[in-house]
């Protein structure tokens, strides 16, 4: 299995349906894309995933952190 968005092979199971074998949620450990195996091919298959939304390593490296992580407050100001 490869990630539909970035084509990485490091995919992990995030969750399984409470009813056995109904659905499974997967997450790419590289770009963090998450999908359920019951979604349409345009969301679950690299070949069908829209070109405009595919990501390269450069896209991932250049992606802004949204929302940005604020600086940690000093011990006495928490």
UniProtKB/Swiss-Prot annotation:
InterPro entries named among the record's database cross-references: VdcD-like
Alphabetical UniProt keywords = Aromatic hydrocarbons catabolism, Detoxification
GO BP terms, alphabetized = catabolic process; response to toxic substance
Q: What's this chain's function?
A: Involved in the non-oxidative decarboxylation and detoxification of phenolic derivatives under anaerobic conditions, however the precise biochemical function in metabolism of phenolic acid is unknown.
Leftover remarks? It is not known, if phenolic acid decarboxylase forms a complex composed of EdcB, EdcC and EdcD. The term subunit is often used in reference to the operon, however there is no experimental evidence to prove the existence of the complex.
Q: What is this protein called?
A: Protein EcdD
Q: What organism is the protein native to? A: Escherichia coli O157:H7
């Amino acid at each position: 299995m490869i990630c539909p968005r970035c084509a990485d092979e490091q995919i992990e199971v995030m969750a399984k349906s409470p009813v056995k074998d109904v659905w499974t949620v997967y997450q790419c450990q590289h770009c963090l894309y998450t999908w359920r195996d019951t979604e349409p091919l345009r969301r679950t298959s690299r070949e069908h995933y829209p070109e405009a939304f595919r990501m390269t390593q450069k896209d991932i490296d250049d992606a802004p952190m949204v929302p940005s992580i604020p600086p940690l407050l000093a011990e006495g100001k928490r």
